[in-house]
Curated annotation (Swiss-Prot):
Its cofactor is Mg(2+); pyridoxal 5'-phosphate. Coiled coil: none annotated. Catalyzes the biosynthesis of agmatine from arginine. GO terms for biological process: arginine catabolic process; putrescine biosynthetic process from arginine; spermidine biosynthetic process. This is Biosynthetic arginine decarboxylase. The modification N6-(pyridoxal phosphate)lysine is found at residue 101. Pathway: Amine and polyamine biosynthesis; agmatine biosynthesis; agmatine from L-arginine: step 1/1. InterPro entries: Ala_racemase/Decarboxylase_C, Arg_decarb_HB, Arg_decarbox_C, Arg_decrbxlase, De-COase2_N, Orn/DAP/Arg_de-COase, PLP-binding_barrel.
Length: 637
């Protein structure tokens, strides 16, 4: 590509669109982060940052967090709603509630809470969906508005703890997911002498589209039907506690890509709100739940990995619909609450790691088959001679398909014992030569060529063996085909010479990234600079801040990675605020009830039985170091 430029790199990896301005490519071809939007010229080179951490003893892979991105995401969402409220003359305020299930890491929750420390009236609360999460938010919510929303299934202990939260000075909304929870809440509130703040989760008929659409609709796991909601109202009236019902909640599902789905869901829920107000309920909070999407691929579309709207459009639609329907019913406008965790956290974290080796197709010269070879091999040689002689463009596809068919036949004949191993190897090499030659002759401008170009890019792609576990660090890429932006951290000032796929170091064939963000959408391979052990480069996996850490598992006993918190000072200096060591081998063994101390005793017994005395101390030391070591690969010398 003689016309390659930095702008071509930015467009090719679509960085400008998925990064929201937080990440970019410098004129030197290095990936940078701009964590503080107030100072966009203050950038950190991720490649140099990683090298500095390695020099300081932080082994790769390392998850790097940028708390200033969290601050910006919180404040930009609040600002979008504040502007919408002003635009439509809405008569109530907005509260952002962070559901800690998205990322419960202490640093993340504390930084989100700190993002509004300077505000006289913080627009921030916390959501819990389990007893452990509730215990956490009870100790943290006072750092913001002290509002806590309790979702999820509940037992008496959960409810009692939530009510104790009221005694601690919090404003705790207990959202009823099941009809049976009401009886428990009423009983525990009487025992504690605490008036509960109740919420209802409405099960809407409308169902948004997307990977998590089962969270909404009539068959959703959570929520109350219209009839059950009326039962709750009747029971509260009988107890003279209808004024305890203060919040209406619904959830369309995570990552709602289409703004029309959000608008339609809010419209239905708004009528629930107004009808309940007319029945005498004192509801004053309207909780739209999650659903605010993240544009992982930067296409601004309705795909599962994108969104066709921005923050202002999201806030405007919610506020506009509520304003109109409340005015129609002549009911007061409620406080708007959203639980937008993915939007807050996705961009703030990037996994940086090294490529430990590659496997690439190398062009090899082939000789014509022996005269007595099967006719099939002669047919393949003919395909090669035709293509190497620069066949007519119209014949390219036919020759390619013939070669593919011949290869399949050769493999079948080998399985039947009618081809030798050497003949099969020759057939495979001949096919690869044809594929390589065809790849160079096809044109993306020809629409009939494009499917074959994609097929050949995948077939001839280099394999990059990358020092990470897909199951630990990007579990959604494996579990639900979530797309995450991936790109080399340096060398992007030169045209990419290869296409590659990223394979992790687990012993699992599913440990492969098979979708990559591209300027045109999603591809099955990634354009990369040539890699070698003499001129290696690092890889970055972006937008991994939501759900990935807590969902990650220990397949092959690869544990948590090292992590670091990095910010940029007012003077532009990089500040590595803290480093948290990842799991050691002993740590992950303990998770599965294997005791490293017992193992050392066993090692000593085996060493004494089998190792010469002069070697014993060294061998035992290496075994002990192994137990204390990082679960990922470190030593390539």
């Amino acid at each position: 590509m003689n016309d390659w430029s930095i702008d071509a790199a930015r467009a090719g990896y679509n960085v400008t669109h998925w990064s929201q301005g937080f990440y970019g490519i410098s004129d030197q071809g290095e990936v940078t982060v701009s964590p503080d939007p107030k100072n966009p010229d203050h950038k950190i080179g991720l490649n140099e940052l990683a090298k500095d951490m390695v020099k300081a003893g932080v082994a790769l892979p390392v998850l790097v967090r940028f708390p200033q991105i969290l601050h910006h995401r919180v404040n930009s969402l609040c600002q979008a709603f504040d502007q919408a409220i002003q635009k439509y003359e809405y008569q109530a305020d907005y509260l952002l509630v962070y559901p800690i299930k998205v990322n419960q890491q202490k640093t993340v929750v504390e930084e989100i809470l700190a993002s509004q420390a300077s505000k006289e009236v913080p627009q921030l609360g916390l959501e819990a969906g389990s007893k452990p999460e509730l215990m956490a938010v009870l100790a943290m919510a006072q750092k913001a508005s002290s509002v806590i929303v309790c979702n999820g299934y509940k037992d008496n202990e959960y409810i009692r703890l939530a009510l104790i939260g009221e005694k601690l000075g919090h404003k705790v909304y207990i959202v009823l997911e099941k009809l049976s929870e009401l009886k428990m809440v009423l009983a525990e509130s009487k025992r504690l002498g605490v008036k509960p703040r109740l919420g209802l989760r409405a099960r809407l008929a409308f169902q948004g589209k997307g990977k998590w659409q089962a969270s909404g609709g009539e068959k959703s796991k959570f929520g109350l039907s219209a009839a059950q909601i009326l039962t709750v109202v009747d029971q509260l009236k009988q107890e003279d506690m209808l004024d305890s019902l203060q919040l209406l909640h619904f959830h369309l599902g995570s990552q709602i890509a289409n703004i029309r789905d959000i608008r339609q869901g809010v419209s239905e829920a708004a009528r629930f709100y107004c009808e309940l107000r007319e029945l005498g309920a004192s509801i004053n909070c309207f909780d739209v739940g999650g659903g605010l999407a993240v544009d992982y691929d930067g296409t601004r579309s309705q795909s599962n990995n994108s969104m066709n709207y921005g923050l202002s459009e999201y806030a405007n639609n919610i506020v506009n619909v509520l304003t109109d329907i409340c005015n129609e019913y002549e009911q007061p406008m409620p406080r708007i609450i959203s639980e937008s965790g993915r939007h807050l956290t996705a961009h703030h974290a990037v996994l940086i790691t090294d490529v430990i080796g590659t496997e690439a197709y190398q062009v090899e010269e082939i000789q014509p088959p022996a005269e007595e070879s099967p006719q099939l091999l002669h047919n393949m040689w003919q395909s090669w001679t035709e293509i190497s002689g620069r066949a007519d463009q119209r014949a390219l596809i036919e020759i390619y398909h013939d070669s593919q068919s011949d290869l399949q036949e050769a493999q079948s004949l080998f399985a039947l014992g009618q081809l030798s191993l050497a003949e099969r190897a020759w057939a495979e090499q001949a096919n690869l030569r044809v594929c390589h030659e065809v790849q160079g002759l096809l044109s993306t401008k020809n629409r009939y060529h494009r499917p074959i170009i994609d097929e050949l890019n995948e077939k001839l792609a280099d394999k990059f063996f990358v020092n990470f576990s897909l199951f630990q660090s990007l579990p959604d890429a494996w579990g639900i085909d979530q797309v995450f932006p991936v790109l080399p951290l340096s060398g992007l000032d030169k045209a990419p010479e290869r296409r590659a796929v990223m394979l992790d170091i687990t012993c699992d064939s599913d440990g492969i990234v098979d979708q990559y963000v591209d300027g045109q959408g999603i591809e099955t391979t990634l354009p990369v600079p040539a890699w070698s052990a003499e001129s290696p480069y690092l890889m970055g996996f972006f937008m991994v801040g939501a759900y990935q850490e807590i969902l990650g598992d220990m397949h092959n006993l690869f544990g948590d990675t090292n992590s670091a918190v990095v910010s940029i000072e007012e003077n532009g200096m990089t500040n590595i605020e803290s480093v948290l060591a990842g799991d050691t081998v002993a740590d992950v063994l303990r998770y599965v009830n294997l005791d490293a101390v017992d193992f050392m005793r066993t090692y000593e017994e085996l060493v004494n039985q089998h190792i010469a005395e002069e070697e014993r101390a060294q061998i035992l030391e290496e075994l002990q170091v192994g137990l204390k070591g990082y679960t990922y690969l470190e030593d390539f010398s």
